[in-house]
Every structure is written in C-alpha cells, then in structure tokens.
Amino acid sequence: AVLFRERGMNDKARLIESAGMPYTSYYELDGYINYFYGCLTPSTGYIQVFDLVPYFDGVLLRVPQRTNPTELEPVIRQDKMFQVYKEHLTLQRTVGLDNVGDLNRAIEKGMTSEVVMVSEAMQEKQVAKIAEEIAARYDNGVRIVLISGPSSSGKTTFCKRLQVQLITNLIHPVGLSLDDYFLNREDTPKDESGEYDFESLYALDLPYFNSELQKLLSGEEIEVPSFNFETGRRVFKGKKLKMQKNSVLVIEGIHALNPELTSMIEDCYKYRIYVSVLTSISLDNHNWIPTTDNRLLRRIIRDYRFRGYSARDTIARWPSVRRGEDKWIFPYQENADAMFNSAMLYELAALRKEAEPILGEVRECDPENAEAYRLLRFLRY
C-alpha cells in the first residue's frame, strides 16, 4: 500500500488496506508501476490489434474478438444504457463512494445503514419515475408493459416493485411471466450441441401466448399456466386473470423486448423497460467490476438456494447463457422506453457472505475451479 500511496494512487492503497493485505504483488511497465486484478499478457507484444475511438465524453477501447483474436470487436453504440450508467455514477459520487475502498471505509465507520438506505432510495425513485411515465401514457393507449433483461438482472423483483408503484398511480397491474409459456420439454428446440436451448425465443409457445394475450386485451378471462421445470411440462392450477377497466398487462421475461414476441400488437399499446446490472462502483480508478460478474454471483446464489444447483453447475452453464443473451436479449435493449439499473452500491459486500462458501465447494480438480478461484479472489476485496 505504501508503494502505491507514494505514487499518488490513494484509491489503490485504500483498497489494499481495507482488504487487510499487508503484502501484494505489482506490475511494472517501462518504469510505470500499477496493479491489475486479473490475468495479464507476459508482454505488450502479445497485443497485435486494438483501437481507441471517441465515445460520449471519453474514449472506447476496442479489443480483439475472443473467437478471432486478429479482428476487433465491432463498435455497438448503447447510448441509452450509457446514459443510465452515467446518472448512477453521478449519484454514487455525490455520496462519496467512488470505489470499493471508499465503500469498505464507510462500512468500517459504521455507515452501513446509511449506504443501504441511500441505495434503496435511489432505486425506489427510479421505479416511481417509470410508473409515473406509464400512468401518463395510459391515457394515450398504453396497455402492455414489457420488462426484459439478461439473466439475474433483477427482472422479477423490479416487476413486483413496479406493480406497487403503478397501484399508487391508480393503475391496476396484471402480471404475466414468460417462464410459464415454455413449450413442453420434448418440443423445445435444441442448439448446435444437441442440448435443449432454453434461451431461444422459440422455446416459448408463441402462438398460444399471443392467443392468450389477445383474449386478455379483449377483456376475456384466461387461465394462466404454470411451467413445471422438473417435469418439463405446462400445468394448470386454476389461476385466472382478467384485465379491469384501469388495468395494464405487465409481462416479464428475457424475450419481452423482442418485437417478434408481441408482433400481433401495435407498438402504440406498449411500454418497454430494460433491466440490467450496471455496476458503476469500481475496485479502484484503474480496475472496473464487470457487470457480468455481479450477475454471475447473483445467479450462483439463486441457483444454489432455489434450484439445487452447485456453483460448478452454474459456472459450467454460464457461457451458454451468455451466448443466448448476445443473440436474444442485448440486440433489443436500445428499443426500451426506460432502463432500470438494479445494482446496489453495497451489493457485492452483501453477496460475499453467501457466495464464498458456495464457491468454496468447487474442487481443484473441477474444470470450473479457475473461474471459481477468480471470483473468490475478487470477493476478498
């Protein structure tokens, strides 16, 4: 820590000190000393292609494609998403939490409850604002709210919070989950590896879903199915739904923003929301926290607690989940009328307590051990 403090890197020194690390390694490049929390190439000669391009009020570093290291990743503008990130970053800096070192110091000073309350208030303000916008558009014909987002982005929790806020705006929400409209297991499409492709839009019973959607919007009552993930079949348990005079239909699922899902409904009746986990807090000024790490940790805990999956199972399936997101979710995120950031300032500190013992069950001989070890090293900060 002294080495970094002498070079004016107080953010890095605070992080190392708050993590209780008396010693740490460091990297040197042409006289410049720094530390990176992950793998580095042995020399700059390994980096054959890269580019820097203007992006908003900064620059975007273009890196090689994983599958084709001689070609750069294409530049895909995500203007709405980046704007939400900037707003969250501004709020975070307003409360003096630029990085994990600042967060750890606040916790050590007994300010945990204040950090939690500020985080909750920031999110509730966002939810209330979106609900007010939906209520304002209700008079112009909006009757369907579509909520999408990648795995473990907090869609279901957001959906529940939004429904409460809609009620305060005198709107009656009628909730519908796309998870209940999966095809029976034997009818589910398979991927190139011959495995069931549950991430595909066509894993849903689209004709049946659209038929039920039309009935609801026409004022008819429907019986909502429930998908049994253990048997892989749709079952009916007598749950009925019917829209009232002041109702909006709130549909939640990873494919909700895909135009093909609700192609039979005109856009003027829809309000689209994209939920993501934009982890704006960074480890220090030179090391950011990937949003995918936050979501992966959420999913590991959720799968372990509610689905009986080990950390090894979740880590093994994660690449397939990510491929599905790249194909079926991310291309439609900029179609959203509103975006919601479900990341909490204190979240990673809270996840650590549950995630560490689960990740610790991955054995050294398991293929997933390298990823589990990386996550454990990251959580120690």
Where are these regions (language model features)?
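P-loop (Walker A) phosphate-binding loop of NTP-binding proteins
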Residues: P150
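Auxiliary tRNA-acceptor-end handling modules of aminoacyl-tRNA synthetases
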Residues: A1-Q126, I130, I134-Y138
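Hydrophobic positions on the alpha1 helix immediately C-terminal to the Walker A/P-loop
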Residues: T157-L162, S177
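Conserved NTP phosphate-binding and transfer environment spanning the P-loop NTPase/kinase superfamily
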Residues: Y138, T262-Y381
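Conserved nucleotide-sensing/catalytic segment adjacent to the nucleotide-binding pocket
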Residues: V174-L176, L183-G232, V248
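Conserved glycine(s) of the Walker
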Residues: G154
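Post-Walker A helix-loop "phosphate-sensing" segment adjacent to the P-loop in P-loop NTPases
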Residues: V164-V174
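Hydrophobic anchor at the beta1->P-loop junction of P-loop NTPases
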Residues: V145-I147
